[in-house]
From Swiss-Prot:
Presence of keyword ATP-binding: yes
Family membership noted in the UniProt record: Belongs to the prokaryotic pantothenate kinase family.
Keywords, in A-Z order: ATP-binding, Coenzyme A biosynthesis, Cytoplasm, Kinase, Nucleotide-binding, Transferase
Pathway: Cofactor biosynthesis; coenzyme A biosynthesis; CoA from (R)-pantothenate: step 1/5
InterPro entries noted in UniProt: P-loop_NTPase, PanK, PRK/URK
EC number per UniProt: 2.7.1.33
Gene Ontology BP terms: coenzyme A biosynthetic process
Chief subcellular location: cytoplasm
Compartments, as annotated in UniProt: Cytoplasm
Catalytic reaction equation(s): (R)-pantothenate + ATP = (R)-4'-phosphopantothenate + ADP + H(+)
UniProt GO molecular function: ATP binding; pantothenate kinase activity
CC annotations in GO: cytoplasm
Protein name: Pantothenate kinase
Gene: coaA
Length: 316
């Protein structure tokens, strides 16, 4: 633990919640409670105070960083005497299952759109790049879903490299949490946004995390700014179980849901199954593949109880 703290002290500036909140300066709050309702995850009680204290300072920081990158591009264009295609600024958001990555991504998207310098902000989740269910079954990876090998990395890297190259239209596959599979014949169109947010479990992964002898590009090679949403594992497991119980009476009750058979479970049965899924799949994936990438992030958002951020770590 001491060695880990020393590494963090060397790499990061640490801000307590109130210290970070003061960095908001005069950035206005443009979201209402109604807006926030649309952005919340199923198991999160995020408040406007959380947006004000954590996300507004972060949107201000990102606006400044994106502006600096845009200015650098203008200087290079002047030096080279040419105008290259528009290239989006790419932000990645990583973290465990149930930590709230998707909510963080949606809130940041909503806030970053308010800045006149970059009004077009798109969001893509890596869930769509999981192999189709039939392929996962064929490869014997159904119980490894979410692990790095369950993703079509070739397709994902092709997608993000086209985005980075400034292609005018790029398509991303869409994932359904109802069917637990890619949506056939439906794709998300990405048309040269100012900023692209890509959210997923393993977006901080590099070649150092694989046993492949041949070097190959990873999502992290194309990312301009990376965020890791962090929490202690006991909290993550608790949040996962709570989310599972809510899905049981919500999404799982849909007859078309892949997990419809869970909808008839008692509370005790559902809790035991969710705990087992965590212990056998999500927990090992966190400790083997996700958590080891945390200290590569430019920014770490640390959560405590009730999904409240209590510390922000920013790379020096």
């Amino acid at each position: 633990m001491r060695a880990n703290n020393q590494i963090h002290n060397a790499l990061y500036l640490a801000f307590a919640r109130q210290q970070w909140a003061e960095l908001r300066k005069s950035v206005p709050l443009t979201l209402s409670e109604s807006d926030l309702d649309d952005l919340r995850g199923i198991n999160e009680s995020i408040s406007l105070d959380e947006v004000t204290d954590i996300y507004l300072p972060l949107s201000r920081l990102l606006n400044l960083i994106v502006g600096a990158k845009q200015q650098r591009g203008l200087v290079l264009n002047q030096f080279l005497g040419r105008v290259p295609p528009k290239r989006p600024y790419i932000i990645s958001i990583a973290g465990s299952v149930a930590v709230g990555k998707s909510t963080t991504a949606r809130i940041l998207q909503a806030l970053l759109r308010q800045w006149p310098e970059h009004p077009k902000v798109d969001l893509v989740t890596t869930d769509g790049f999981l192999y189709p269910l039939s392929e996962l079954k064929r490869r014997g990876l159904l119980q490894r879903k979410g692990f790095p090998e369950s993703y079509d990395m070739k397709l994902l890297v092709e997608f993000i490299s086209k985005i980075k190259a400034g292609e005018s239209l790029v398509h991303a596959p869409i994932y359904s949490h109802i069917s637990y599979d890619r949506v056939a014949d439906t794709q998300q169109a990405i048309e040269q946004p100012d900023i692209l947010i890509i959210e997923g479990l393993n977006v901080l992964q590099t070649g150092q995390d694989t046993h492949v002898a041949i070097q190959q590009p990873f999502v992290s090679d194309f990312v301009d700014f990376s965020i890791y949403v962090d929490a202690e594992e006991p909290l993550l497991k608790e949040w996962y179980i709570s989310r599972f119980l809510k899905f049981r009476t919500g999404a799982f009750s849909d007859p078309n849901s892949y997990f419809h058979h869970y909808s008839e479970l008692t509370d005790d049965e559902a809790t035991k199954i969710a705990a087992n899924i965590w212990d056998s799949i999500n927990g090992p994936n966190l400790n083997l593949n996700i958590l080891p990438t945390r200290d590569r992030a430019h920014l770490i958002l640390r959560k405590g109880t009730d999904h409240m951020m209590h510390q922000v770590l920013m790379r020096k």
